[in-house]
């Protein structure tokens, strides 16, 4: 029986662990190598008063599985952030970390990669390489169709009750979860995508894939990265005392930064380094 989503797509989610916290990310294959993409707030703590960002820790781990759902052991990379440069977007809540460089292609068309300085293998999984979103699977912002089906990949660690024993948990927090929704709209002024799909703590930085039906065939494209949920704000005023209580809840909508914005950012950083 075939799977609804292509097998390789299940390899894209990356669990990011840093400073006792966790978030989501994914690997993106650019022309020169593979990059870890996530939301900036997954790696950085924001000082709202001074408008400064500080890394949650000096080291971070990236954990990912292969396309085989029976795989027991993930590939875990360790990144020394004192050696590896983290680039943050000046406008969007986006951070990238270059993980490896492409050396040459095998006869089968696979890239032979080499991890850059500061990236080491902490645990070798049943797959010995990272699986990144290829460029030909990236959807441009201008081509995104409102109402199309989407899937959010990530590690929503805020769901469920964390028991002392992993066996007692309803969820396996070491594995990604998928969430299905639709493209609800586009904000052309901000150049962001609005999705009708609940986003929870831990989903930030995760990949969003768009599903398009072409001639009775499903095709999947990388849409962008989840950065936050859109809040539902309700102000309740007491008629007796005149006080106002503000309630903020998850509206079920989320914000996605398009993948071509990320690719443009990578290209600018490469040009600035030369």
Give residue ranges: language-model regions.
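Catalytic histidine site
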Residues: 4-78, 96, 100-102, 182-186, ...
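Catalytic nucleophile loop of clan PA
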Residues: 197-226
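Hydrophobic alpha-helical segments and helix pairs
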Residues: 77-132
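Short glycine/Trp-rich loop-beta-loop segment that forms part of the substrate-binding cleft
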Residues: 119-168
């Amino acid at each position: 029986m075939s799977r609804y989503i292509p097998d390789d797509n299940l390899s894209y989610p990356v669990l990011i662990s840093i400073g006792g916290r966790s978030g989501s990310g994914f690997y993106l294959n650019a022309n020169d190598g593979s990059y870890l993409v996530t939301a900036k707030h997954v790696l950085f703590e924001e000082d709202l008063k001074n408008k400064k960002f500080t890394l949650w820790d000096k080291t971070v781990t990236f954990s990912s599985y292969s396309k085989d759902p029976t795989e027991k052991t993930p590939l875990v990379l360790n990144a020394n952030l004192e050696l590896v440069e983290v680039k943050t977007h000046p406008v969007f809540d986006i951070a990238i970390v270059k993980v490896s460089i492409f050396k040459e292609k095998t006869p089968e068309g696979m890239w032979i990669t080499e991890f850059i300085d500061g990236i080491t293998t902490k645990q070798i999984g049943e797959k010995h390489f990272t699986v990144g979103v290829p460029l030909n699977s990236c959807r441009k912002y201008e081509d995104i169709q409102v109402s199309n089906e989407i899937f959010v990949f990530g590690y929503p660690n805020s769901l469920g009750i964390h028991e002392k024993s992993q066996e007692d948990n309803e969820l396996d927090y070491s594995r990604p979860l998928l969430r299905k929704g639709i493209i609800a709209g586009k904000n052309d002024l901000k150049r962001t995508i609005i999705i009708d799909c609940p986003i929870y703590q831990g989903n930030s930085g995760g990949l969003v894939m768009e599903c398009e039906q072409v001639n009775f065939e499903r095709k999947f494209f990388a849409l962008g990265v989840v950065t936050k949920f859109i809040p539902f704000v309700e102000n309740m005023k007491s008629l007796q005392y005149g006080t106002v209580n503000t309630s903020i809840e998850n509206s079920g909508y989320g914000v996605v930064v398009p993948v071509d914005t990320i690719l443009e950012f990578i290209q600018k950083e490469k040009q600035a380094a030369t």
